């Protein structure tokens, strides 16, 4: 990823240092903190049951963001954070607990937060990529004051920053609840035994009060199909599938429900759904790896 950033934007202003090792005294003053902490523990490439969230080795990198916001004197006015949408349901034993911990952490640090799950293809992009984006506003900011004057529903469906960029309409009843202000209690007790997360794909939190609801995207532009971005011309042979391998590819991409044997001799039932093969050029590209 670091090499790609350098190639696209040049080496100036780019750093590949581990943020966990950088003293906050060396981080310059900034108005906007952007972060996309690793998603291996939340990704749809693994099952929810195996997701470790904040407990997992990768998930704890969230606390690097928390450390910066806790230690620097002049906190950034705005936060722009992103993760896979599975974050709203993680971990499997306490649906939504990890996101609740993050929201309460940001509340403790003096921020209001709004979030939305956005699929890039729903707004004209050439890839089906679903991610949750959450924006934070410091309590002394102009946006926070505007949010405070508005009602949660007006903000989420009319006045909010996300809504004014990515239009959406209400698709469910509104749910409201208050987060416990003790992070340890949230970590231990939030939604224990709950089969469904309390967080929908759209919502906001201000002063610990959460408002959340389902929305659906509203986009009046044209979709961008995969064929419109593919390079024209001869395709190198290394990217071609020999005809002799097509049956194997069709099997791998097809639906399955079969018995398999593990390395230690355990017989188990393996099942998975099918994937389109070959990819439909008239549709936006599927998400690489996770195949949404």
Regions found by a protein language model. Name each.
Residues 1-75, 83-99, 107:
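Core alpha/beta nucleotide-donor-binding catalytic domains of modification enzymes
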Residues 14-17, 85, 111-122:
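Conserved S-adenosyl-L-methionine
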Residues 38-42, 85-86, 121-124, 139-141, ...:
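Short, solvent-exposed loop/turn segments at secondary-structure junctions
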Residues 78:
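Short glycine-centered segments of the SAM/dcSAM-binding site in methyltransferase folds
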Residues 100-117, 138-142:
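A SAM-dependent methyltransferase catalytic signature shared across enzymes that methylate proteins
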Residues 102, 114, 128-132, 284:
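Residues that flank catalytic or metal-binding motifs in active/ligand-binding sites
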Residues 125-203:
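Flexible, glycine-/basic-rich loop-and-beta segments that form/coincide
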Residues 203-292:
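C-terminal target-recognition/interaction regions appended to catalytic cores
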């Amino acid at each position: 990823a670091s090499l790609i950033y350098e190639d696209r934007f040049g080496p100036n202003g780019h750093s590949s240092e581990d943020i966990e090792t950088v003293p906050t005294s060396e981080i310059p003053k900034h108005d906007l903190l952007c972060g996309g902490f690793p998603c291996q523990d939340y990704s749809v490439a693994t099952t929810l049951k195996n997701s470790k969230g904040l407990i997992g080795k990768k998930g704890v990198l969230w606390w690097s963001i928390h450390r910066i916001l806790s230690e620097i004197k002049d906190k950034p006015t705005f936060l722009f954070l992103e993760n896979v949408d599975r974050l709203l349901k993680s971990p499997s034993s306490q649906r939504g607990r990890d996101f609740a911990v993050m929201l309460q952490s940001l509340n403790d640090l003096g921020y209001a937060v709004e979030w939305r799950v956005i699929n890039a293809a729903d707004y004209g992009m050439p890839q089906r990529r679903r991610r949750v984006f959450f924006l934070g506003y410091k309590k002394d900011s102009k946006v926070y004051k505007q949010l405070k004057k508005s009602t949660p529903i007006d903000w989420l469906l009319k006045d909010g920053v996300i809504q004014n960029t990515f239009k959406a309409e209400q698709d469910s009843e509104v749910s409201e609840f208050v987060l416990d202000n003790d992070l340890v209690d949230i970590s231990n007790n939030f939604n224990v035994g709950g089969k469904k997360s309390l967080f929908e794909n759209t919502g906001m939190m201000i002063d610990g009060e959460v408002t959340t609801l389902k929305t659906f995207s509203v986009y009046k532009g044209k979709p961008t199909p995969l064929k419109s971005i593919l390079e024209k011309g001869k395709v190198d042979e290394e990217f071609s599938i020999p005809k002799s391998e097509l049956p194997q590819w069709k099997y791998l991409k097809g639906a399955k429900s079969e018995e398999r044997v593990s390395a230690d001799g355990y017989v188990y039932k393996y099942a998975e759904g099918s994937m389109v093969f070959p990819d439909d050029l008239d549709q936006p590209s599927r998400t690489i790896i996770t195949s949404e």
